[in-house]
Amino acid sequence: KESSAMKFERQHMDSSGSPSSNSNYCNEMMRRRNMTQDRCKPVNTFVHEPLADVRAVCFQKNVACKNGQTNCYQSNSLMHITDCRVTGSSKYPDCSYGMSQLERSIVVACEGSPYVPVHFDASVGPST
């Protein structure tokens, strides 16, 4: 069975680089990473940074998770991420996604030994 840590990597890690001008990035990646198998996952974030940098967030700023749990951590630095959101016209099994490329601080939930990210909680824009 897929561990929570492996699932996090499958759903959220794409260290190979950013999608640049490929408007099909979300459609391809959501399919390739098995997030459109039994439904169209409505929103998903891919992080374009080395896995070691994302794992390191577990030892950075401790914050509350959206669900009230206390094992979330916010990255000290901005990270290149891509938000994929299902479009209104999307109909399973033809899942279609819009894409936004952002530079934001990420919030992940961590657990286990080794202590690693198991859930992507949020991304935070530069505070104005």
Swiss-Prot record:
Record has Glycoprotein as a keyword: yes
Region (Disordered): 1-26
Catalytic residue list: H12, H119
Record InterPro entries: RNaseA, RNaseA-like_dom_sf, RNaseA_AS, RNaseA_domain
Subunit relationships: Monomer. Interacts with and forms tight 1:1 complexes with RNH1. Dimerization of two such complexes may occur. Interaction with RNH1 inhibits this protein.
Name of the protein this chain belongs to: Ribonuclease pancreatic
A Gene Ontology biological process term: defense response to Gram-positive bacterium
One GO CC term, this protein: extracellular region
SS bonds (residue pairs): C26-C84, C40-C95, C58-C110, C65-C72
Glycosylation sites: N34
